[in-house]
Structure formats: structure tokens, C-alpha cells
């Protein structure tokens, strides 16, 4: 579960086609070991759920970047399939018991995409 409140903004640094989808790598000064700005993201671990532009993804690799595998269905149902290197994405870690809830309960499980036709 997430709150929907953005915690970090990261730049897409790599997009690769993999079996069944795409590998997405993002860099963030907030998680870079060279930036000195680690807390509260210093304890990230593989398998952790991270919201990337509102989509719940499992972290598969950490370091000075974060890596996620995005399956084909998620690419079709979300805007992640439109990403290009250099784009910025919003990140949020999943809630832990006892965390303050400053937003709303958000699962990050996407059903479909919509199109704005008028403003």
C-alpha cells in the first residue's frame, strides 16, 4: 500500500527489452551512495514494492540506481511503456505499519488507462 505522496523523483537511465517485458533502471540522488543523501532510502532491499509513477513494481536490483522488470501487461495498462531515457518518474516506498498516512490508501495496481478529451 502507498499514500500517493511522491517521496523522490528519479531520472530514467536505461530501458531494455527482456523476456516478457522491459527492464527499467532509474537513478536518484536520493539513493546514490555517492550523494550522501541516503536516509530514509538507505535500507532498500530487492523484492521491496516501490511505486513508480503510481505503478507498484518490485525492486530487483539496487545500487546507485534502482532496477525493475515491467511485464507486458503493465506496459499496456500504464504509461510506463511510453517512458524514454531521460524522463523523470515519481517514486514512493510502500507503507510500513506505524507510518503516518498523509494521503490515501493506494494499491498501485492499475486496471486501465484513460484519455483526457477536454479541459
In which residue ranges do the predicted regions lie?
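Conserved loop->alpha-helix
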Residues: 1-119
Amino acid at each position: 500500500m502507498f499514500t500517493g505522496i511522491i517521496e523522490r523523483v528519479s531520472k530514467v537511465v536505461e530501458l531494455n527489452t527482456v523476456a516478457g517485458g522491459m527492464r527499467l533502471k532509474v537513478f536518484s540522488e536520493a539513493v546514490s551512495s555517492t550523494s550522501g543523501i541516503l536516509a530514509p532510502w538507505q535500507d532498500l532491499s530487492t523484492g521491496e514494492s516501490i511505486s513508480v509513477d503510481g505503478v507498484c513494481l518490485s525492486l530487483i536490483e539496487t545500487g546507485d540506481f534502482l532496477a525493475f522488470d515491467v511485464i507486458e501487461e503493465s506496459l499496456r495498462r500504464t504509461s510506463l511503456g511510453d517512458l524514454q531515457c531521460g524522463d523523470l518518474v515519481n517514486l514512493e516506498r510502500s507503507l510500513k505499519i506505524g507510518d503516518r498516512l498523509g494521503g490515501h490508501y493506494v494499491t498501485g495496481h492499475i486496471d486501465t488507462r484513460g484519455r483526457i478529451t477536454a479541459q
